Amino acid sequence: MELFRNTNIDFLGKKWYFLAFSLVFSVAGLISMGARYAKTGTAVPLGVDFKGGTLVYVKFAQTPNLGDIRAAMDRSGLKDPKIQTYGGPANNEVLIALEQKETSEQALDAGKNTIIKALETNPASGKNDLNNVGSTTIRDYLMSKDPLHEVVDPGAKYQQIASQIVDYRDKERGGVLSSVDELQGHVPADVVNALKTDYFTSGFGVRNVEIVGPQVGKQLSNQALLATLYSLGGMLVYLWFRFELIYGIGAVVACFHDTIITVGAFSLLNRDISLTVVAAILTLIGYSMNDTIVVYDRIRENIKLLRRESLADIVNKSINQTLSRTILTSGLTFLTVLSLYVFGGEVLRGFSLALVIGILIGTYSSIAVAAPMLVAYQEWRGHRGTAALPGPAPRKNDRVKVKA
C-alpha cells in the first residue's frame, strides 16, 4: 500500500527550515530544564519513583472524584500530592503519591493514617473504620468485648474470625465493605452485632502502602540515564558495523535530538518523569532508529545504482521513495498511542504522552536530521559533485572509501 507515488520533494533544499525548527524546540526544552535545575536542583520534574516518597493505593466503593480527593488532601495539609486513577474504569482505584523523606515503619503508618483521616468526609463519631483496619486490631477488639463468651483460648478463636473478616473484605469485596451487615452469614451474628457498636464502613479502603526511599530513587535515576546512554551507544556500534561510522553518528544524533525535545516537552508541560516515561523514551529511541535505518538502507542501495548523481540528489530521492512507508507506519503507530493517551487513564498518561511526542519527532528526525547529516558530512570533508558516501556492501571491493 502506498500513500504517495512518485513524490519529488526537495527535502535538502529545506534543511535550514528544519534546522531552525529543531533548534527552537531543542533550545526551548534546554532553557526550561536549565531554569528548573537552577530553581529546584533537578532539570525535569521527577516522580516518586526517582525522588522518593510514599505510594498509597486506595480502593473506592463508588467512582472516585479526583478533584474532591485533591481538595481533601489540601485541607489536611498534604503537600502537592500526585493523584491518579489506575486499573480499569470499573475498578474505582486511585494511587496517591506523597513526598516523604522518612522511610521508617512509623512514617509509613503516619502517612497512611493521614490519608485515611483526610478521605473520611463523614466519619461516625468515636467509631473505627472496618475498611481500614487489620486482623490484629479486629482480634483485639473482639477479645475485649468477648461477644461469644469464649472460655477456652479466646485469642485463637477471635484471630480466626478476624482473619475471616479481612479475607472476605479484601478477596471477595475488593477491599471495601458497604456496611458491617455484609458480614452476616460469614461470621457469627453476635460478632457482627458487637462490631456494629464500635465500627462503621467508609466508602474506601487503603489496599497497600509502599515507600520509595531517596537512595533508591537516586539509584533508579542513574540506572535510567545509563540505560539511555547504553542503548544509544549500542546502536552506534551496530550501525558502525552495518553501515559506515557516519551513519551511526547521524542516527544517534537524531535519537539524541528526539530525546532532548521529548524530555524538554515534559519540563515545559511540568509533567513528571517516571519509570514508565523512561520506558517510553527507550521505546521511541528504538522506533526512531528503526525509521532511520529504513531511509539509510534505501540511500545505500541508491548509492550503488546511481553512482553518477550527487549524494544530495541520492538522499532526496531515497527519502521520497521511503516517504509513503514512513508516514503509513508512523501514522498508524501515532493513532494507537494517541488512543492510549486519550483513553488509557492517568497511570499511562505520561507513557503515552512521551510516545505521542516521540513518534512525531522521531519521524521528522529520520527525514530532516539523520539523512541530511550524510550530505553535511561529505560537504564538510570537501567531497562534492558525484563523489558518493560509501554504503556497506557485503561483497568484496563494493565499497568506496571517503578519503580524508
UniProtKB/Swiss-Prot annotation:
State the Gene Ontology BP annotations. Answer: intracellular protein transmembrane transport; protein targeting; protein transport by the Sec complex
InterPro entries from the xrefs?
SecD/SecF_arch_bac, SecD/SecF_bac, SecD/SecF_CS, SecD_SecF_C, SecD_SecF_C_bact, SecF_bac
Q: Which gene encodes it?
A: secF
What GO cellular component term, any one, is given? plasma membrane
- MF terms per GO, please? protein-transporting ATPase activity
What does the record give as the function of this protein? Part of the Sec protein translocase complex. Interacts with the SecYEG preprotein conducting channel. SecDF uses the proton motive force (PMF) to complete protein translocation after the ATP-dependent function of SecA.
Name the keywords, alphabetized. Answer: Cell inner membrane, Cell membrane, Membrane, Protein transport, Translocation, Transmembrane, Transmembrane helix, Transport
Protein name, as recorded:
Protein translocase subunit SecF
Say if the entry is tagged with keyword Translocase.
Answer: no
Location, primary (coarse class): membrane
